[in-house]
Curated annotation (Swiss-Prot):
It comes from Meles meles (Eurasian badger). SMART domains: KAZAL. Signal peptide: none annotated. It is found in: Secreted. It comes from the Eukaryota. SUPFAM superfamilies: Kazal-type serine protease inhibitors. This is Double-headed protease inhibitor, submandibular gland.
Length: 122
């Protein structure tokens, strides 16, 4: 089955039009009120979230207020073999944060962290 999209993927949609009053220019304050996107990146506030996600190839929503539990900002395609398991919302185990973050990217933000550690066996 394809990964869930839209509301099924979790997160809330943001009305970004309130931040770009002057055409397509965003006027964001430096006020720190972090939010975590469904791309597992922490943005300093909702306005910065809107500005930095407007040109993404997929729709990013706000997963939670505050910093992300798992930060996927700086990961390459090449992952180490470290073993620090994470359980994804798809029920799959990911050996480490790098592999999980690459899966988040491939899922276009539909995958999120279910829990730290391995998923429960059926």
């Amino acid at each position: 089955a394809p990964p869930p999209v839209g509301d099924q993927a979790g997160g809330r949609k943001v009305n970004c039009s309130k931040y770009n009053a002057k055409g397509s220019q965003f006027a964001c304050s430096r006020h720190l009120d972090p939010v975590c996107g469904t791309d597992h990146r922490t943005y300093s506030n909702e306005c910065m979230f809107c500005m930095l996600t407007q040109n993404k190839r997929f729709s990013v929503r706000i997963l939670q207020d505050n910093n992300c539990d798992i930060e996927c900002t700086q990961y390459s395609d090449m992952c180490t073999m470290d073993y620090l398991p994470l359980c994804g919302s798809d029920g799959n185990n990911y050996s480490n944060k790098c592999l999980f973050c690459n899966a988040v990217l491939r899922s276009r933000g539909a995958l999120f962290l279910a829990k730290h550690g391995q998923c429960e066996s059926p």
